[in-house]
Curated annotation (Swiss-Prot):
Family matches, as Gene3D superfamilies: 3.30.1370.30, 3.30.1490.10
GO biological process, one term: translation
GO molecular function, one term: structural constituent of ribosome
Protein name: Small ribosomal subunit protein uS8
Function in brief: One of the primary rRNA binding proteins, it binds directly to 16S rRNA central domain where it helps coordinate assembly of the platform of the 30S subunit.
Keyword presence, Membrane: no
Domain of life: Archaea
PROSITE patterns the UniProt entry points to: RIBOSOMAL_S8 (PS00053)
Amino acid sequence: MARDIVADFLSHLTNVRRKGEDKTAFFPVSNLIIKLVEIMKREGYIKNYRLVDSSRGKIIEIELSEYFNEANAIKPRFPVEYSELEKYEKRYLPALNFGRLILSTSKGLITNREAKEQKIGGVLIAYVY
């Protein structure tokens, strides 16, 4: 059975927050995980991160922001049109303008806010708030 690295990564971050900790390290790291972390840093959910080379491969060290509460992968990965974004925001986010959906589009990974500005759809990957 295949392993969902995105779901593992996001549930790891949520568990770290629930334990009351701010710093963590995660292995294995893929380009998708790095892009997710960059979006979360840009949106203010991660204070800082760094990639560390080890004998097992790359490890990502993350410092969570006080604004991070929860993150989770969306399964199944729904294809979403621009006009349907609000429906999924209501479904996955706790309040209006609180949190972000992360979509995979032809222009790379973007948030729901960027997708609305660019008027494009994509495939739902995760949510974070």
